[in-house]
Curated annotation (Swiss-Prot):
UniProt cross-references to InterPro entries, sorted A to Z: Aldolase_TIM (IPR013785), RibuloseP-bd_barrel (IPR011060), Trp_synthase_alpha_AS (IPR018204), Trp_synthase_suA (IPR002028)
Protein name in the entry: Tryptophan synthase alpha chain
Gene responsible for this protein: trpA
Species lineage: Bacteria, Pseudomonadati, Pseudomonadota, Gammaproteobacteria, Enterobacterales
The enzyme's E.C. designation: 4.2.1.20
Name of the top EC class for this enzyme: lyase
SUPFAM superfamilies: Ribulose-phoshate binding barrel (SSF51366)
GO CC entries: cytosol
Keywords associated with the record: Amino-acid biosynthesis, Aromatic amino acid biosynthesis, Lyase, Tryptophan biosynthesis
Length: 268
């Protein structure tokens, strides 16, 4: 959890926002997936948001669903994802690592055991996409017991009660949704979210990172200008993986070329 705090403190000092890429662990296979993650970090990623392949991803649009299918086709299991996380953490000791996943994968292990495993391999945060704030008590309590930040989604239509709960229960960062619906780069982020950002700050919420539909540097800049601490980009990155599925080296070069200007946009 502390890795987020020190990241945001460092970025504040440098007057930068955070750029956080999302990929699915094991897409398109374990070895290439690890290379992809190294490339994202080398190209300037400030933190990682990683998905564990799940058979019924409700919040995801077709791009990320396809990533999940590719990981399944490669035979990737949740246990292998945990091993991958341990490898990523060994290689990159300071970068915050967040998981974005679904409740079933947590239940399969047992809630406490799942968060214990996260702590052991060096995961900093977990966002359980299909658990609303009002049902989150067993998840967030287990998370905090194991020094893992529970992350909550702040939708664009959040009312005051929800904003207060998110501020009170969330740690690490707040996932600020650009718009309703499923993930996807083709649905551009709708701004402005200034009023939400102002309220979250007022209630001392964890720093907001804006996600959903972030696929260009101008959107990263707009998110930060609206007061967000940074931006998360998933579908646009996963699309690059899809486009170069048979050319692993080209894929890594294209990912680097995408991430560098996205990170540069946090420095304006």
């Amino acid at each position: 959890m502390e890795r987020y705090e020190s990241l945001f403190a460092q970025l504040k000092e440098r007057k930068e926002g955070a750029f956080v890429p999302f990929v699915t662990l094991g897409d398109p296979g374990i070895e290439q997936s690890l290379k992809i993650i190294d490339t994202l970090i080398e190209a300037g990623a400030d933190a990682l948001e990683l998905g564990i392949p799940f058979s019924d991803p409700l919040a995801d649009g077709p791009t990320i669903q396809n990533a999940t299918l590719r990981a399944f086709a490669a035979g990737v299991t949740p246990a292998q994802c945990i091993e991958m996380l341990a490898l990523i953490r060994q290689k990159h000791p300071t970068i915050p690592i967040g998981l974005l996943m679904y409740a079933n994968l947590v239940f399969n292990k047992g809630i406490d055991e799942f968060y214990a495993q996260c702590e052991k391999v060096g995961v900093d945060s977990v966002l359980v996409a299909d658990v609303p704030v009002e049902e989150s008590a067993p998840f967030r309590q287990a998370a905090l017991r194991h020094n893992v930040a529970p992350i909550f989604i702040c939708p664009p239509n959040a009312d005051d009660d929800l904003l207060r709960q998110i501020a009170s229960y969330g740690r690490g960062y707040t996932y600020l949704l650009s718009r309703a619906g499923v993930t996807g780069a083709e649905n551009r982020a709708a701004l402005p979210l200034n009023h939400l950002v102002a309220k979250l700050k007022e209630y001392n919420a964890a720093p907001p990172l804006q996600g959903f539909g972030i696929s260009a540097p101008d959107q990263v800049k707009a998110a930060i200008d609206a007061g967000a601490a940074g931006a998360i980009s998933g579908s646009a990155i996963v699309k690059i993986i899809e486009q170069h599925i048979n050319e692993p080296e080209k894929m890594l070069a294209a990912l680097k070329a995408f991430v560098q200007p996205m990170k540069a946009a946090t420095r304006s």
